[in-house]
């Protein structure tokens, strides 16, 4: 995958929810963590990240609170809600079904 490749459409919610499952994080840190964990294969652009964070907050899956980042800048920290924790399981199951389907097509064609 090209180093500047954006995240596959439809997977961003899953990646964000999984990334903040262990601890609240601010937007830039979420994008950096996804990039780091994926060995630089996935990059989340700000133009995709912040609308997704707002959508997830509107759906009640995450909350946002103002705090200080590691360099003492004011930032919004995003955390999973109880509903968000349930949604992680739903999103993982959807991804596993989709991935299995794609693998079948790749193997049988």
Which residues make up each language-model segment?
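Beta-hairpin "wing" of winged helix-turn-helix
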Residues: 57-74, 79
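Accessory beta->alpha helical hairpin/"wing" motif in late/C-terminal subdomains of nucleic-acid enzymes
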Residues: 80-84
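Basic amphipathic alpha-helical segments that dock to polyanions
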Residues: 49-56
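N-terminal helix-turn-helix DNA-binding core of bacterial DNA-binding proteins
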Residues: 4-48
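Short, contiguous hydrophobic alpha-helices characteristic of membrane insertion segments
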Residues: 4-6, 60, 109
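Short beta-strand/turn micro-motifs at beta-sheet edges
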Residues: 2-5, 66-67
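Amphipathic alpha-helical dimerization/coiled-coil segments
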Residues: 86-109
């Amino acid at each position: 995958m090209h180093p500047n490749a954006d995240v596959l459409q439809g997977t961003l919610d899953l990646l964000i929810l999984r990334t903040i499952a262990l601890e609240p994080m601010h937007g830039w840190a979420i994008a950096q963590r996804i990039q780091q964990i994926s060995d630089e294969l996935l990059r989340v652009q700000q133009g995709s990240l912040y609308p997704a964070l707002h959508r997830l907050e509107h759906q009640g899956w995450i909350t946002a609170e103002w705090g200080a980042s590691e360099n003492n800048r004011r930032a919004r920290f995003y955390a999973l809600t109880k509903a968000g924790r349930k949604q992680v399981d739903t999103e993982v199951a959807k991804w596993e079904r989709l991935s299995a389907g794609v693998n079948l097509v790749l193997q049988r064609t």
